[in-house]
């Protein structure tokens, strides 16, 4: 009997704690009492949210930044393994392009962060190999040598510039030695009159490529994002030929890419006592009041070993705000309980993009076997292939332990989803990081099996990794490493809706998932969308006080 009374008491306690509900009628929303009142609420502490907060640091208004987990940075995630503590591993974004990523370049300078050369770039000639259809090929062989594809004579002549050739055949546009702009790409038509963006990769290349030529173009692209399913054909040409990728040096931040949002938030917090940051807050719902303010309903979360859990038994926190910036991935945004997001106008706009899973697996070894000419004839700092590991990058040597680090797999799409299944099977390997970042025996074996094929060595000769860590960009709130634009959608037709889904509400959306083409997979895309929204709707809040402008003029 005592046990039954205890259980009843616990039920009453939990019910009373979680008894706050999201208001449903206009009257109940107007009557809602707030636990906290702000001028501006920013939800999401990734690059776009951190940048938005930073730009408003001098606003003099009550600005709150809320983050789902216990970590700021979003898809910028710098990590250190215990045996290589002096080397930053980038589990998310790892580089940027000077001359193309101008906002990020300026922000790093403004924050006093040091940028250094990203050694391998995108795979440098002489240091990069491809493993295609079971054959190991040098970069030069892929460009102009024998490849295991039955290309036509004209495709063979254009092997090293296959995308330039196909674009000209499709649309008549000759790129020459230059690049192509977004505006130009979106106006291009194929021979039957259709706009190029209305076609998928397969539909477009079927018009001009041989079956083998199409597969060659697909495989040398490596990433699945732009060349599978309903991906917009413009995306792959933008990736190879667009002006957004045409820059100078490829750099990274010496202190780690995550240092950028960390420093942005640090500056935001220290500038004013009215600027605040709250971690481990899950935004469950938004409701409007008659006075055009908003009630944001947050549920506390808990993060352990990289996995964040929503604490459903904890009461909702009600935060009221006059304006809201949702710096959320589209995966999380579409799951938010806010009625305007689920109306036709917004639903149509967000349907323009598709989530693309992405992943990285780092391993450390006591020898750099992939660079040892006594071990393999196929030595390479970077290997790209049509196998589940997709891409492998040499990642330096630790001066602390002398151990060597490898991105053993950098994958997207179905390769990532397959590897995630393997990650969730079996025991963790010795030296694996815990929780969401673990590397299992099946995952390790699959990656090393395929790497042994690419390097032409017996699997048994590859040493066991000393430590390992994985990151799968598949779960809430991210749902993906980046997005791809679906065929049939014109960016300019949906961009304004994506960034302001309801014209009568001051709720705005920022982040890389709402940026154009190639930029959607870069930090620059997150900063671009934030910059655009801030310039359109928050000019006053982003203005520097006169004293700051005066100081800057003497420091330039």
Curated annotation (Swiss-Prot):
Superkingdom, taxonomy of origin: Eukaryota
Keyword list, A-Z: Antibiotic, Antimicrobial, Glycoprotein, Signal
Q: Name one Pfam family in it.
A: Amino_oxidase
Q: Which cysteines are joined by disulfide bonds?
A: none
A single GO molecular-function term is:
L-amino-acid oxidase activity
Q: In which tissues is it expressed?
A: Albumen gland.
GO terms classed as biological process: amino acid catabolic process; defense response to bacterium
Signal peptide residues are 1-19
SUPFAM superfamilies according to UniProt: FAD-linked reductases, C-terminal domain (SSF54373), FAD/NAD(P)-binding domain (SSF51905)
Q: What does this protein do?
A: Has antibacterial activity against Gram-negative and Gram-positive bacteria.
Quaternary state and partners of this protein?
Homotetramer.
Q: Which family does it belong to?
A: To A.fulica achacin protein.
Q: What name has this protein been given in UniProt?
A: Aplysianin-A
Q: What is the organism field in this record?
A: Aplysia kurodai (Kuroda's sea hare)
């Amino acid at each position: 009997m005592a046990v039954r009374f205890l259980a009843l008491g616990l039920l009453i306690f939990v019910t009373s704690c979680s008894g706050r509900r999201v208001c449903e009628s206009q009257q109940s929303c107007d009557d809602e009492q707030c636990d906290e009142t702000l001028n501006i609420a920013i939800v999401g502490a990734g690059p776009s949210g951190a940048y938005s907060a930073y730009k408003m640091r001098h606003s003099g208004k009550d600005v709150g930044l809320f983050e789902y987990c216990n970590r700021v940075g979003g898809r910028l995630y710098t990590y250190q393994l215990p045996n290589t503590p002096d080397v930053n591993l980038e589990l998310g974004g790892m580089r940027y392009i000077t001359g193309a990523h101008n906002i990020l370049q300026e922000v790093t300078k403004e924050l006093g962060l040091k940028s250094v050369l990203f050694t391998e770039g995108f795979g440098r000639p002489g240091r990069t190999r491809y493993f295609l259809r079971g054959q190991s090929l040098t970069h030069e062989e892929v460009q102009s040598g024998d490849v295991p594809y039955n290309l036509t004579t004209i495709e063979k002549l254009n092997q090293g510039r296959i995308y330039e050739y196909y674009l000209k055949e499709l649309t008549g546009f000759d790129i020459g030695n230059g690049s192509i702009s977004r505006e130009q790409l979106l106006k291009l038509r194929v021979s039957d009159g259709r706009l190029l963006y209305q076609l998928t990769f397969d539909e477009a290349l079927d018009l001009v490529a041989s079956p083998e030529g199409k597969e060659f173009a697909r495989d040398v692209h490596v990433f699945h994002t732009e060349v599978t399913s309903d991906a917009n054909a413009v995306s792959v040409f933008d990736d190879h030929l667009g002006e957004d990728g045409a820059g100078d040096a490829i750099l990274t931040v010496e202190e780690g890419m995550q240092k950028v949002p960390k420093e942005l938030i640090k500056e935001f917090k220290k500038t004013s006592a009215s600027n605040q940051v709250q971690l481990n807050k899950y935004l469950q719902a938004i409701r409007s009041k008659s006075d055009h303010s908003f009630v944001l309903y947050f549920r506390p979360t808990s993060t352990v070993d990289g996995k964040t859990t929503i604490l459903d038994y904890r009461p909702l926190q009600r935060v009221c705000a006059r304006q809201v910036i949702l710096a959320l991935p589209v995966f999380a945004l579409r799951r938010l309980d806010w009625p305007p997001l689920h109306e036709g106008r917004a639903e149509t706009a967000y349907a323009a993009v598709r989530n693309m899973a992405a992943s990285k697996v780092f391993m450390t070894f006591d020898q750099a076997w992939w660079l040892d000419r006594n071990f393999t004839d196929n030595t390479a700092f970077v290997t790209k292939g049509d196998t589940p590991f997709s891409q492998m990058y040499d990642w330096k040597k630790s001066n602390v332990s002398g151990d060597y680090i490898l991105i053993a797999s950098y994958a997207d799409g179905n390769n990532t989803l397959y590897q995630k299944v393997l990650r969730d099977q079996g025991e963790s390997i010795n030296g694996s990081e815990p929780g969401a970042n673990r590397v299992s025996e099946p995952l390790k074996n699959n990656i090393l099996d395929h790497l042994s094929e690419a390097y032409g060595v017996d699997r048994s000769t590859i040493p066991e990794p000393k430590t390992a860590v994985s990151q799968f960009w598949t779960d809430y709130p991210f749902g993906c490493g980046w997005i791809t634009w679906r065929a049939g959608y014109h960016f300019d037709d949906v961009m304004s809706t994506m960034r302001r889904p309801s014209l009568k509400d001051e709720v705005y959306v920022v982040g890389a998932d709402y940026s154009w083409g190639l930029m959607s997979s870069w930090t620059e895309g997150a900063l671009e969308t934030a910059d655009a929204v801030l310039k359109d709707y928050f000019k006053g809040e982003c203005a520097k006080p006169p004293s700051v402008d005066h100081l800057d003029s003497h420091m330039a």
